[in-house]
Amino acid sequence: MAFRKKADYILLQKPDILIIPECEHPDKLKFDKDTPEPTDIFWCGTNRNKGLGVFSYSNYKFELVDNHNPDFKSILPLHVTGGQTDFTLFAIWANNPQDKDGQYITQVWKAIHYYDNLLLDNKTILIGDFNSNTIWDKKYREGNHSPVVGKLAAKKIFSTYHKFYGYSQGAEQHPTLFMYRHQNKPYHIDYCFASTDFIENLKNVEVGTYNDWTQYSDHKPLAVTFELPQNKN
């Protein structure tokens, strides 16, 4: 379902920032008069019906980093400013069928090497649809899910879900995808990785349920709440 058709339901969560994979171009976003308007939008994609949208419903503003590499389709490195703290946000929809090396997690693997200098142990978040899980690691593939997790951990950047609930990678108990909306096909493929300063201020992580969200999407929202110090820039 298009974002414009489910925005009212999503916005009941009162997000500061929304990451929406498979999102229509902003020109197509026609909301009802009572629907809150975003204060800033950043969108990329080659298909006007399915791109990657980043929305602010707060004081945060987005700016693409100078060394953005468009070869990593739908991985957006953004400077986020104007809110409680400035930080670097990697909005992710890992899906590039043109890359013969691998269209899903391999995209993230390549991107975190290219943007290595931006992956700091503070003020860094990577979030979105990684289309991956440790259970799908392949023996002869370098860019598996587990090496991605390992490289980020070496930078002191960790999965908020796994930190909050204490599960290991591959042992998640809250699916973020029910493939084809079938309840018997649950997978955890959406993540929010955050640097230690965010992890230290992690307040809550919640995954939407099958019953609440299936009418809107095969994916379930991953909502992450940080309790940040005021005006920490």
Predicted stretch roles:
Residues 1-35, 230-233:
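N-terminal, active-site-proximal structural segment of metallo-dependent hydrolase catalytic domains
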Residues 17, 107-189:
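Metal-dependent phosphoesterases centered on the DNase I-like endonuclease/exonuclease/phosphatase
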Residues 90-108, 134-139:
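Surface-exposed cleft-lining segments at the edges of enzyme active sites
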Residues 215-233:
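Surface polyanion/phosphate-binding segment centered on an Asp-His-Pro turn
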